[in-house]
Amino acid sequence: CLYLSLELSAWYMHRRNMQIVSGLDKEQVTDNYEEIYNLHKDKLNHIVIQTIAPNLDQIQQKIRELQPAVVVVDYIDLISTNGRYMGEYEQVKQVSHYLSNLAVNMDIIIIQISQVSRSYSREERLDLYAGKGSGAIENASRKVIGLNGQANNDTKEVSMLKNTDGELFDTELVWQPSFRLRRT
């Protein structure tokens, strides 16, 4: 798995992954980092985290180099594009379509993560059009999954907002201090 974490540090992402595989909270992982890593390294060694914002060609080059089965891009609006004067929508459209084509041509899964636009965030609602550049994302994607919830409430809702080969659904989950989400 190649994880392009363009907002959070590699250590932060690594610690979160250790929390998930161990079921422990942040303090427990931080206090016993080496022991926990040694217990779970077989579940973590396949994850490569890159924190430098690449352009589209560099993403393709890294995929060719590592041959991952899954690529996660967190967030797509932080990917550099070649267009100097593109608006936000055009930039997201270029990135989303490029990554979609890469997924098809290289036979891999690419998960594109997008932030919610301000208006949807203020209204505390989530639908297919809530993401920044959502029309472009929806157009280039075979599946769109939304994760909705407020910081002060551990209950979150996962919704399949688009699914070209299956059903749509909503399910409630509870966030755990280990960053796991458990179905309620």
Feature locations, PLM:
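C-terminal regions of RecA-like/P-loop NTPase motor modules
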Residues: 26-28, 57-71, 101-106, 118-184
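Flexible beta-alpha connector loops of hexameric P-loop NTPases
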Residues: 27, 48-50, 80-93, 122-129
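A structural motif corresponding to the C-terminal end of an alpha-helix
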Residues: 41-48, 99-110, 140-142
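Conserved H-loop
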Residues: 6-8, 108, 112-115
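Generic enzyme active-site microenvironment
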Residues: 5, 72, 113, 140
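Cytosolic-facing regulatory segments adjacent to core modules
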Residues: 1-69, 81, 131, 171-172
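Helical hairpin unit composed of two closely spaced alpha helices linked by a short loop
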Residues: 69-112
